[in-house]
């Protein structure tokens, strides 16, 4: 079973994080071990918009998964071939557990990235992390990134 924590980075900090994703990962992996979100996480991340995520799940994933259930505040999506996704909400993150094919992860990431471009995921305990929707670099963004390093 694969486990992810997914955060929505505040738009005002996105430009400062680009190129420093390793530092963000180091912070977020520490947050996973705390029952309450760290102060730094509350500062850098938006509160998860549950309606936005619910819409992404129902509108986009409801078409390809056999069952989409909501019980005890947790989404459970089941596909007969790919497997099962469990999604739990906390104020600043989503906790996702995928049991089955890696296609489950891809389906969820595509749905969330279509809903908003600022989602950043870490794979708990595996050292994998990244933007769900890759950031497009313009020349101006690259020049600013060099200045802020």
Set out the residue ranges of the language-model regions.
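Acidic (Asp/Glu-rich) sequence patches and key acidic residues
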Residues: 1-91, 103-110, 122-149
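Short cationic amphipathic helices and targeting signals
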Residues: 92-99
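Short hydrophobic/aromatic-rich beta-strand segments that constitute the beta-sheet cores
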Residues: 96, 121-122
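A common structural junction motif
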Residues: 112-119
């Amino acid at each position: 079973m694969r486990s992810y924590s997914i955060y929505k980075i505040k738009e005002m900090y996105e430009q400062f994080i680009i190129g420093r994703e390793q530092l963000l990962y180091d912070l977020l992996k520490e947050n996973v071990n705390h029952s309450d979100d760290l102060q730094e996480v509350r500062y850098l991340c938006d509160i998860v918009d549950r309606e936005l995520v619910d819409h992404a799940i129902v509108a986009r994933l409801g078409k390809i998964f056999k069952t989409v259930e909501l019980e005890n505040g947790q989404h459970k999506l089941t596909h007969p071939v790919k497997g099962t996704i469990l999604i739990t909400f906390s104020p600043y993150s989503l906790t996702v557990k995928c049991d089955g094919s890696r296609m489950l992860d891809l389906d969820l990431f595509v749905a969330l990235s279509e809903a908003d471009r600022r989602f950043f995921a870490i794979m708990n305990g595996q050292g994998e992390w990244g933007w769900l929707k890759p950031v497009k670099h313009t020349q101006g963004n690259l020049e600013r990134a060099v200045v802020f390093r």
